[in-house]
């Protein structure tokens, strides 16, 4: 979105609600690993190894995101529960890839309305196959442009969706808040909004 014109008309039927969630952008993650100069060719093998040692696992990334974005995730749930235009109640949640920040948002909403954990994990795990091909390779090309190798930890971070990652996120939510509903409440979602979310999601079909 920062590199290309907005494709949607501002006066059209789609209302865009921007909710920045820091820490989830793969490009931002990659840039954060680079030295201040950002000059990829200067990276020595030891420097590359040191950078790769800083790469978080998806589980670590998800816990970090959750720890600082309860208000944003609550706003996503609120927007779904009470859409800005009642005549057009459908919602599309998306980030750059639709994997990490989106995966957490969808997992939170599904968990908060009572979806079985196994179904949430299975839904998240499907993302990897959906991203395979051009998108995944473009992400690895971006890493290569920064002088970083095609390392397993980078490929997982940018292109994969192992069940263990979302399992770790759900475990953290349970340990820190009890459940997803309580996590969303900690971000400002009210009980009435939570009830509306459950009604809208369960009656959507």
Task: Enumerate the predicted regions with their spans.
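Ser/Thr-glycine-rich phosphate-binding loops at phosphate-binding pockets of nucleotides
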Residues: 97, 101-102
